[in-house]
Protein backbone atom coordinates (compact mmCIF):
# COMPACT_ATOMS: atom_id res chain seq x y z
CA UNK A 1 0.00 0.00 0.00
CA UNK A 2 1.33 3.35 -0.91
CA UNK A 3 -0.86 5.70 1.13
CA UNK A 4 -1.54 5.94 4.80
CA UNK A 5 -4.82 4.51 6.13
CA UNK A 6 -6.16 7.91 7.20
CA UNK A 7 -6.09 9.02 3.57
CA UNK A 8 -8.25 6.01 2.65
CA UNK A 9 -10.85 6.28 5.43
CA UNK A 10 -12.84 9.49 5.53
CA UNK A 11 -13.26 11.32 8.82
CA UNK A 12 -16.74 12.59 9.57
CA UNK A 13 -16.89 16.32 10.30
CA UNK A 14 -18.27 17.11 13.75
CA UNK A 15 -20.89 19.32 12.11
CA UNK A 16 -22.49 16.23 10.53
CA UNK A 17 -23.78 15.30 13.98
CA UNK A 18 -26.41 18.01 13.44
CA UNK A 19 -28.21 15.33 11.41
CA UNK A 20 -27.56 12.07 13.27
CA UNK A 21 -29.13 9.87 10.59
CA UNK A 22 -26.83 11.35 7.94
CA UNK A 23 -24.02 10.94 10.44
CA UNK A 24 -24.80 7.21 10.84
CA UNK A 25 -24.80 6.82 7.04
CA UNK A 26 -21.41 8.52 6.85
CA UNK A 27 -20.12 6.46 9.75
CA UNK A 28 -21.24 3.29 7.99
CA UNK A 29 -19.35 4.46 4.91
CA UNK A 30 -16.22 4.87 7.07
CA UNK A 31 -16.69 1.34 8.39
CA UNK A 32 -16.97 -0.01 4.84
CA UNK A 33 -13.73 1.79 3.97
CA UNK A 34 -12.16 0.20 7.05
CA UNK A 35 -13.35 -3.22 5.83
CA UNK A 36 -11.80 -2.56 2.42
CA UNK A 37 -8.50 -1.67 4.07
CA UNK A 38 -8.65 -4.76 6.27
CA UNK A 39 -9.28 -6.96 3.23
CA UNK A 40 -6.31 -5.44 1.42
CA UNK A 41 -4.10 -5.68 4.50
CA UNK A 42 -5.00 -9.35 4.92
CA UNK A 43 -3.37 -10.20 1.59
CA UNK A 44 -0.44 -7.76 1.67
CA UNK A 45 2.86 -9.62 1.56
CA UNK A 46 4.92 -7.01 3.40
CA UNK A 47 4.77 -6.00 7.06
CA UNK A 48 3.08 -2.60 7.33
CA UNK A 49 3.21 -1.54 10.98
CA UNK A 50 1.45 1.81 10.49
CA UNK A 51 -1.47 0.18 8.71
CA UNK A 52 -1.77 -2.65 11.23
CA UNK A 53 -1.60 -0.19 14.14
CA UNK A 54 -4.28 1.95 12.52
CA UNK A 55 -6.55 -1.07 11.94
CA UNK A 56 -6.03 -2.07 15.56
CA UNK A 57 -6.98 1.41 16.78
CA UNK A 58 -10.12 1.37 14.62
CA UNK A 59 -11.18 -2.03 15.99
CA UNK A 60 -10.53 -1.03 19.60
CA UNK A 61 -11.94 2.51 19.53
CA UNK A 62 -14.24 3.17 16.58
CA UNK A 63 -16.02 -0.16 16.40
CA UNK A 64 -16.77 -0.29 20.13
CA UNK A 65 -18.02 3.29 20.09
CA UNK A 66 -20.26 2.59 17.12
CA UNK A 67 -21.88 -0.41 18.80
CA UNK A 68 -22.59 1.77 21.86
CA UNK A 69 -24.11 4.46 19.63
CA UNK A 70 -26.56 1.99 18.21
CA UNK A 71 -27.30 -0.19 21.23
CA UNK A 72 -27.60 2.58 23.82
CA UNK A 73 -29.09 5.35 21.70
CA UNK A 74 -30.44 4.58 18.23
CA UNK A 75 -32.05 1.18 18.83
CA UNK A 76 -33.91 2.16 22.04
CA UNK A 77 -35.28 5.25 20.26
CA UNK A 78 -36.46 3.13 17.35
CA UNK A 79 -38.13 0.63 19.66
CA UNK A 80 -39.99 3.51 21.31
CA UNK A 81 -41.05 5.25 18.09
CA UNK A 82 -41.59 2.48 15.54
CA UNK A 83 -45.08 1.57 14.39
CA UNK A 84 -46.24 -2.08 14.37
CA UNK A 85 -45.98 -2.22 10.56
CA UNK A 86 -42.26 -1.40 10.86
CA UNK A 87 -41.63 -4.88 12.38
CA UNK A 88 -38.58 -3.40 14.06
CA UNK A 89 -38.24 -5.72 17.07
CA UNK A 90 -37.10 -8.77 15.11
CA UNK A 91 -34.72 -6.69 13.01
CA UNK A 92 -33.15 -4.93 15.99
CA UNK A 93 -32.95 -8.25 17.83
CA UNK A 94 -31.02 -9.70 14.91
CA UNK A 95 -28.69 -6.70 14.75
CA UNK A 96 -28.09 -6.79 18.52
CA UNK A 97 -27.15 -10.46 18.19
CA UNK A 98 -24.78 -9.54 15.37
CA UNK A 99 -23.27 -6.78 17.53
CA UNK A 100 -22.55 -9.33 20.27
CA UNK A 101 -20.88 -11.64 17.76
CA UNK A 102 -19.05 -8.69 16.17
CA UNK A 103 -17.50 -7.75 19.51
CA UNK A 104 -16.29 -11.34 20.00
CA UNK A 105 -14.90 -11.43 16.46
CA UNK A 106 -13.34 -8.01 17.01
CA UNK A 107 -11.54 -9.36 20.07
CA UNK A 108 -10.03 -12.11 17.91
CA UNK A 109 -9.10 -9.61 15.19
CA UNK A 110 -7.50 -7.43 17.86
CA UNK A 111 -5.37 -10.34 19.07
CA UNK A 112 -4.33 -11.14 15.50
CA UNK A 113 -3.33 -7.54 14.80
CA UNK A 114 -1.45 -7.29 18.10
CA UNK A 115 0.39 -10.51 17.25
CA UNK A 116 1.38 -9.16 13.85
CA UNK A 117 2.74 -5.99 15.44
CA UNK A 118 4.59 -7.90 18.15
CA UNK A 119 6.14 -10.40 15.72
CA UNK A 120 6.55 -7.79 12.96
CA UNK A 121 4.91 -10.03 10.37
CA UNK A 122 2.25 -9.40 7.71
CA UNK A 123 -1.28 -10.60 8.32
CA UNK A 124 -1.09 -12.77 5.21
CA UNK A 125 1.72 -14.82 6.74
CA UNK A 126 -0.77 -16.84 8.77
CA UNK A 127 -3.92 -18.36 7.25
CA UNK A 128 -5.88 -18.21 10.51
CA UNK A 129 -5.18 -14.50 10.91
CA UNK A 130 -5.86 -13.77 7.25
CA UNK A 131 -9.17 -15.66 7.21
CA UNK A 132 -10.27 -14.10 10.49
CA UNK A 133 -9.79 -10.57 9.18
CA UNK A 134 -11.43 -11.37 5.86
CA UNK A 135 -14.44 -13.01 7.53
CA UNK A 136 -14.81 -10.08 9.90
CA UNK A 137 -14.77 -7.59 7.02
CA UNK A 138 -17.33 -9.62 5.05
CA UNK A 139 -19.71 -9.92 8.01
CA UNK A 140 -19.33 -6.24 8.89
CA UNK A 141 -20.21 -5.17 5.33
CA UNK A 142 -23.35 -7.31 5.39
CA UNK A 143 -24.35 -5.89 8.78
CA UNK A 144 -23.86 -2.30 7.61
CA UNK A 145 -25.87 -2.93 4.44
CA UNK A 146 -28.81 -4.20 6.48
CA UNK A 147 -28.68 -1.18 8.78
CA UNK A 148 -28.52 1.22 5.83
CA UNK A 149 -31.34 -0.51 3.95
CA UNK A 150 -33.76 -1.12 6.81
CA UNK A 151 -32.91 0.64 10.08
CA UNK A 152 -31.90 4.12 8.99
CA UNK A 153 -34.89 4.70 6.67
CA UNK A 154 -37.23 3.79 9.54
CA UNK A 155 -35.28 6.10 11.84
CA UNK A 156 -35.56 8.92 9.31
CA UNK A 157 -39.31 8.35 9.11
CA UNK A 158 -40.16 7.80 12.78
CA UNK A 159 -37.80 9.89 14.92
CA UNK A 160 -39.03 13.34 15.88
CA UNK A 161 -36.97 16.53 15.81
CA UNK A 162 -36.62 16.21 19.58
CA UNK A 163 -35.45 12.59 19.25
CA UNK A 164 -32.88 13.64 16.67
CA UNK A 165 -31.66 16.52 18.85
CA UNK A 166 -31.26 14.20 21.83
CA UNK A 167 -29.55 11.57 19.69
CA UNK A 168 -27.20 14.22 18.33
CA UNK A 169 -26.30 15.37 21.84
CA UNK A 170 -25.65 11.83 23.06
CA UNK A 171 -23.45 10.96 20.08
CA UNK A 172 -21.52 14.21 20.54
CA UNK A 173 -21.14 13.69 24.30
CA UNK A 174 -19.74 10.21 23.75
CA UNK A 175 -17.07 11.85 21.58
CA UNK A 176 -16.52 14.92 23.81
CA UNK A 177 -17.76 17.21 21.03
CA UNK A 178 -19.58 20.46 21.79
CA UNK A 179 -22.79 20.36 19.79
CA UNK A 180 -24.99 22.87 18.07
CA UNK A 181 -28.74 22.21 17.74
CA UNK A 182 -29.58 19.08 15.74
CA UNK A 183 -32.17 18.57 13.09
CA UNK A 184 -32.93 16.93 9.80
CA UNK A 185 -30.56 17.53 6.94
CA UNK A 186 -32.10 18.57 3.68
CA UNK A 187 -29.10 17.37 1.72
CA UNK A 188 -27.74 14.04 2.93
CA UNK A 189 -27.01 12.78 -0.60
CA UNK A 190 -23.26 12.97 -0.14
CA UNK A 191 -23.31 10.39 2.62
CA UNK A 192 -25.84 7.90 1.28
CA UNK A 193 -23.53 5.96 -0.99
Residue ranges, per PLM feature:
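Small-residue-biased structural context
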Residues: 1-193
